[in-house]
Amino acid sequence: MTVAYSLENLKKISNSLVGDQLAKVDYFLAPKCQIFQCLLSIEQSDGVELKNAKLDLLYTLLHLEPQQRDIVGTYYFDIVSAIYKSMSLASSFTKNNSSTNYKYIKLLNLCAGVYPNCGFPDLQYLQNGFIQLVNHKFLRSKCKIDEVVTIIELLKLFLLVDEKNCSDFNKSKFMEEEREVTETSHYQDFKMAESLEHIIVKISSKYLDQISLKYIVRLKVSRPASPSSVKNDPFDNKGVDCTRAIPKKINISNMYDSSLLSLALLLYLRYHYMIPGDRKLRNDATFKMFVLGLLKSNDVNIRCVALKFLLQPYFTEDKKWEDTRTLEKILPYLVKSFNYDPLPWWFDPFDMLDSLIVLYNEITPMNNPVLTTLAHTNVIFCILSRFAQCLSLPQHNEATLKTTTKFIKICASFAASDEKYRLLLLNDTLLLNHLEYGLESHITLIQDFISLKDEIKETTTESHSMCLPPIYDHDFVAAWLLLLKSFSRSVSALRTTLKRNKIAQLLLQILSKTYTLTKECYFAGQDFMKPEIMIMGITLGSICNFVVEFSNLQSFMLRNGIIDIIEKMLTDPLFNSKKAWDDNEDERRIALQGIPVHEVKANSLWVLRHLMYNCQNEEKFQLLAKIPMNLILDFINDPCWAVQAQCFQLLRNLTCNSRKIVNILLEKFKDVEYKIDPQTGNKISIGSTYLFEFLAKKMRLLNPLDTQQKKAMEGILYIIVNLAAVNENKKQLVIEQDEILNIMSEILVETTTDSSSNGNDSNLKLACLWVLNNLLWNSSVSHYTQYAIENGLEPGHSPSDSENPQSTVTIGYNESVAGGYSRGKYYDEPDGDDSSSNANDDEDDDNDEGDDEGDEFVRTPAAKGSTSNVQVTRATVERCRKLVEVGLYDLVRKNITDESLSVREKARTLLYHMDLLLKVK
């Protein structure tokens, strides 16, 4: 039964509770808690004063300190949920009194600030009310003070309950999380963006006359102008565009204008994608100059939102990163923001600076303009000093742990691509001890959770809680792993400072224990598991660098089962969509469905790729015994381009200098047809491979302008390089692939002025040149040109049939594929990034007498004894002539002037060799 309270009683209670936190708590306990039934039942028939009194008292009661909220417990959340779902004031927003709307929105802001993830079903009503209020009142300058502050409170609410995280500056995340909208919500977003733009333009127009660049450029006039004819335009002088200066301070004097501008501009950053490109505010030079002037404002919120507005395009627009001039203007103000106190909740200078460094580390790692600018200041040393102070704290609370995590992340970004910062950080001998302790603490927490999993599962079942919160230090340990990954990129650090078995042991333990979590503790829910799977991916990223050829810890990792752990993961349906889930794993499948695992897959393959770099054939077959070729090929069409890239790069290293593995790969792409031999009557197999067709189609699908897709294409090209290096029969298979030759032509034809399709990438060009090189190099002769001259094949001379009866070419272009081929010796593998090259591998293959027997993927064999070197030379000459016919000779000659030194040198060597072959008659 609802207890009725009069207006006077409500006001009396409200006045008695001001400043008394404990008295407020009493109203959440019986019997006083019955008052909430009255307060939540706001009827349309209630008078304005009664509605306002109920809203005021609700606001007073819910305005509790964190300690008092803990005392109240879940009942506080129940009241918030009831306010969201039971009150009907949102649906009648356009009909309500302006003061009632203001108090209601202010109450919602209080609730959203405490529980930002609590769903609010009536948000669309408030958006419609906001749009109507802006268009019908604000733009016509008819707003009362109550309506202005209501607009401000609405903007705050939209920021709090919006589904996007406004502090996320990572471009890939920004694109992935951009919501799919229906036609209705699409229109709603457009109207929201339009209303926000109207607010921004109306307020900014009041202060545009404050833009002043007179102290930068003198404007020459031909005759004096009367004061009445002078119009302030900061772009009257054409030299202004060339200056790096920022205009004088623009001061927003009106506090309502200041709040409206900062909140509207911040929210506009979320909806601006709805505005056509030519109408966006950031494309308006005058408005951009206005925002630059706001960087010097007295209002911290204005300065912070100006920074966000100016920096966001670097993460959301393709070519904006090239504008380093503007970035150099903004960076000092971003650095200065570290001293702002207090900072608005939606602004994190650590995250912004870290995201900028990461962005340029990916695009221009050797010339990061952010680090270059910071190097001219003492900012980095100040950050390191504060970082050391955080590490020296005897214990951490939630706030200090978050701050320390931010310091670790930004130090990881500093050290990711710059050796001097790695050495600077590693000079602190205690840093690695702190790192090891951070990893050990997380391992202990995981072990404790696994040991208590039965009790925890029972508790979650009884409380009907489907998701547990993540382990409290997940961000902390992830930051340490990122820092370790940055350190491990240094060759000298791997051989000296990081030569600690304990670090490798801790990495393996984290990987193993976290995988056990995914197998046994999936009941904890996605909120718990997502951070742990993210930690798995980062851990594998660090292990990638610890298993490189020159690392002292590679053997330790192998002895302690890194391949076995990866084999378990790659055969798990969670990480391999080609594997079927067992019938008894339905609960696990449902619990973990949708969790992103692409980083784990990509880095697992990357670890194997590094292990297979420059290794013996014996080691390759040991790997394939545990992780067979079929399992590797499961990831060749993965939805994530990064996974595909690592899969092709792994195949590149496996096929290098290994004829057997080349044949295994061809076997996996075989089409076999059985026919009757007309002479003997025996059944024979006619085999062909669709590997090249698959590779050609894959390259056509790839966009080399994307970094990961470019790496995938590079891997494919080097697989073809390795195929062409095996023997004459494999060369013949490659030379017949017209589509692949066309793709190579498209890559080699590009220049700096015409690079629309493939980006004029030097790595892709070099790979194409290596394919051509191996097609034309004699697989069975160590010194091809010397041998040709010794056999009388000097320029202008062609031996007749009488001189050499076996000089005819027996490997035809159009012959059907059949069994058997004459063996050829590998020669001249490229020294590319990950293409392994080992002379001993030739001996390994030569000792395998039965290697080529029954090989289906070769040309029709010549007669016994017809394997003369002249015969092979003839096939090489024919291949060279075909390359000339398709225009590749001209493209090779064109690339001798390429801007890349490696491409120029390879093109010159190849051109010289082709010229020699073309002289053979």
Curated annotation (Swiss-Prot):
Domain of life, per lineage: Eukaryota
Region of interest (Disordered), ranges: 822-867
Compositional bias ranges of the Acidic residues kind: 829-855
Gene Ontology, cellular component aspect: cytoplasm; GID complex; nucleus; vacuole
Effects seen without this gene: Negatively affects glycogen accumulation.
Keywords, ordered alphabetically: Cytoplasm, Nucleus, Phosphoprotein, Repeat, Ubl conjugation pathway
Subcellular location: Nucleus; Cytoplasm
InterPro entries (UniProt xref): ARM-like, ARM-type_fold, ARMC8/Vid28
Keyword Glycoprotein: no
Any one biological process term the GO annotation gives: negative regulation of gluconeogenesis
Function: Component of the GID E3 ligase complex recruiting N termini and catalyzing ubiquitination of proteins targeted for degradation. GID E3 is regulated through assembly with interchangeable N-degron-binding substrate receptors induced by distinct environmental perturbations. Required for the adaptation to the presence of glucose in the growth medium; mediates in association with the substrate receptor VID24/GID4 the degradation of enzymes involved in gluconeogenesis when cells are shifted to glucose-containing medium.
Entry protein name: GID complex subunit 5
Source organism: Saccharomyces cerevisiae (strain ATCC 204508 / S288c)
